[in-house]
């Protein structure tokens, strides 16, 4: 006989759906700049979840010496054939280096040359030892004031009324528990949508894609179903690869 479904009610000021790199850093930022309560809901565990769950060997968006944020905007605009929001790109590019320096303070190992400068890899990248990127970020989140984490809870729908969002509902993937979360503000940080197309690699390698297969597009669906305004859906990035190459990123 199965146990009856338990329903838990939670109230918070800010609900962050998704505990990947973006969700965790958002929680850190809010905690540092306010006294509001924050709840991070993650369907896996924030220590190893999201695009950087397994780590990364470079910061692939950085303004190296001699370059400006606008240079990155120009590069990304050309790469996407002009189908971009330049304002969003510039806002992000202006924060690249500050966030990178912050991650170094949290313990991220960034390779440096004999002069103590970051080792650049091209015009927009620097080399790192980033296998522990996510654990470092998770540790910082757990130490932050007024931040709670719900691991292994999958959020499925937003709660809306009169065109406004006031929370979300979801369920535990480990226990027979449903969650009703009320929040004054909701931030969706669930990543993109992987697996839309047939995998490039066969068998056990089919998960070697640009984004983790667990990025299901759930955040997009929640927004669309709730009437949220969506943007930049006109452009779909596809990483180009050389024939017979098995790699998670592009090779061209």
What do the predicted segments below correspond to?
Residues 206-215:
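A short acidic, glycine-rich active-site loop
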Residues 1-13, 21:
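Generic start-of-chain signal for non-secretory N-termini
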Residues 186, 215-219:
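Extended, hydrophobic alpha-helical segments in both membrane/secreted and soluble proteins
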Residues 3-6, 36-37, 43-166, 170-172, ...:
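Conserved N-terminal/central alpha/beta ligand/cofactor-binding core
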Residues 223:
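Acidic, metal-coordinating catalytic segment for phosphate/diphosphate chemistry
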Residues 9-12, 175-185:
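Core beta-strand elements of the Rossmann-like FAD/NAD(P) dinucleotide-binding domain
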């Amino acid at each position: 006989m199965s146990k009856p479904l338990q329903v838990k009610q939670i109230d918070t000021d800010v609900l962050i759906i998704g505990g990947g790199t973006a969700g965790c850093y958002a929680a850190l930022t809010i905690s540092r700049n306010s006294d509001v309560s924050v709840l991070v809901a993650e369907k896996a565990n924030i220590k190893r979840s999201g695009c950087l769950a397994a780590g990364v060997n470079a910061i692939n968006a950085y303004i190296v010496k001699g370059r400006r944020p606008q240079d990155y905007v120009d590069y990304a605009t050309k790469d996407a054939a002009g189908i971009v929001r330049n304002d969003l790109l510039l806002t992000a590019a202006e924060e690249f280096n500050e966030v990178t320096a912050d991650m170094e303070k949290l313990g991220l190992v960034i390779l440096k040359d004999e002069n103590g400068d970051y080792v650049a890899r091209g015009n927009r990248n620097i080399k790192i030892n980033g296998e522990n990127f996510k654990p470092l970020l998770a540790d910082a989140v757990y130490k932050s004031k007024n931040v709670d984490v719900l691991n292994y809870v999958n959020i499925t729908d937003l709660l809306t009324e009169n065109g406004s969002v006031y929370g979300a509902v979801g369920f535990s993937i480990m226990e027979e528990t449903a969650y009703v979360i009320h929040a004054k503000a909701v931030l969706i940080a669930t990543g993109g949508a992987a697996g839309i197309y047939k995998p490039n690699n066969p068998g056990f390698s089919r998960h070697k894609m640009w984004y983790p297969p667990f990025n299901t597009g759930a955040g997009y669906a929640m927004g669309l179903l709730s009437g949220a305004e969506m943007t930049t859906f006109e452009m779909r990035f596809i990483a180009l690869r050389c024939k017979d190459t098995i790699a998670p990123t592009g090779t061209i």
